[in-house]
Amino acid sequence: MSQTHLSNQKFADLPLHPEVKQALAENGFEFCTPIQALSLPVLLQSKDIAGQAQTGTGKTMAFLVATFNHLLSSSIPEGRQLNQPRAIIMAPTRELAIQIAKDAILLAKHTRLKVGIVYGGESYDVQRKVLDQGVDILIGTTGRIIDYVRQGIINLNAIQAVVLDEADRMFDLGFIKDIRFLFRRMPNADQRLNMLFSATLSMKVQELAYDHMNDPVKVEIAPEEKTSKNIKEEIFYPSQEDKMRLLLTLIEEDWPEKAIVFSNTKHSCENLWSWLEGDGHRVGLLTGDVPQKKRIRILEQFTQGQLDILVATDVAARGLHISDVSHVYNYDLPDDCEDYVHRIGRTGRAGNKGVSVSFACEEYALNLPAIETYINHSIPVSNYDRDALLDDIPSPVKIHRKHPAGARNLRERSGAGRTPGAHRSGGRPPRHDRTRRQP
């Protein structure tokens, strides 16, 4: 294969259930990614897996294919009740759970298996109606799953397959006690297929695996490569005064098809949104306090191309599967080295090329040495000509506090005097090659 992100292993050559093969073929899945090629032969023998793989490697489809195949090839537990799912997939964030559910629905099309999803931020009653009808594969965040288990709405005695995705993130967010609580209410480890995936297989993650899994096979994909070779990284050292002007100038030069701008705080993200919106970009804002329905709407707009730029805190850095992100801008260097890897991992996915641009300003430059040590390479430095930065930038729009993240509503109240999205429809032309020179 000339596409290095795929292996030579075809899904059609694996001993998969016919309905799974049909769904894969209809959705264009022909060749496995490396993590799929390594893990599926093991899982199809009903052996447990502890897999190390970063986001964007295809691990989601690996555990979904294995889960569907296992349920379709196994007998339904005797005496199973309507409130007893046969498989459970746990994710650290609702965004990741939603994406997993979307992929699961693709595989479920030709099967009799029902997929359900539960997570915080949505109505208990709405989700309960789905559960009351019975689900075979339950996908969700641990907190909401535990709520339903404690209420007796869900019973885990018929679980035949378990997936724990992004286990390292589960530790970061303090969910491990919840996970152990759920494991203790399932059949014994040797009576179910167990799958754990993590960006790092640290000692604490491996301990969790061996405590609640049946002698799992360890599968690793290029653990020494923290960042993808498909991502072109660079870093600027702007003054605080130049920082916003530099970002706006670079965006106008790069003209990204789809970009994510990361900042470390909600306040900074809101400020970024205001300037980008005022400059005529189609931009959405995603922070931790955005209501779930609005969050889903913004992500759909970004995915469907109605928005070109997403401004986000690290709530969006993990678990989002958004294709064709061409650029990532780290307006602030993150305090956590792993967050840098997860941020820039939003681009350069599935063999595509991507660009990551970071700013080492006075406030966050001290984070850079630890990041470069963690990723095991220096980030190339780019310089800029201060006199070439944009100087005719419109004023930022003001955020209406009752509607903190709805780009459409905010634009209607901005009074900025420019056509929304003017850059994309014949507005001010981009100023190419005005800021960069060879370092």
From Swiss-Prot:
SUPFAM superfamilies, per the entry: P-loop containing nucleoside triphosphate hydrolases
MF terms from GO for this chain are: ATP binding; ATP hydrolysis activity; RNA binding; RNA helicase activity
> Where, by residue number, does ATP bind?
53-60
Give the Basic residues compositional bias ranges: 425-439
Q: Which UniProt keywords apply?
A: ATP-binding, Cytoplasm, Helicase, Hydrolase, Nucleotide-binding, RNA-binding
Q: What is its main location?
A: cytoplasm
Positions of the region Disordered?
Answer: 395-439
This entry's Enzyme Commission designation comes to 3.6.4.13
Q: Where is the Helicase C-terminal domain?
A: 243-390
The record's Gene Ontology cellular component field reads: cytosol
Which residue numbers does the motif Q motif cover? 9-37
Looking at the record, the residues that make up the Helicase ATP-binding domain are: 40-219
GO biological process annotation, one example: RNA catabolic process
Function (record text): DEAD-box RNA helicase involved in RNA degradation. Has RNA-dependent ATPase activity and unwinds double-stranded RNA.
The family line of this record is:
Belongs to the DEAD box helicase family. RhlB subfamily.
Q: NCBIfam families from the xrefs?
A: PRK04837.1
Q: What is this protein called?
A: ATP-dependent RNA helicase RhlB
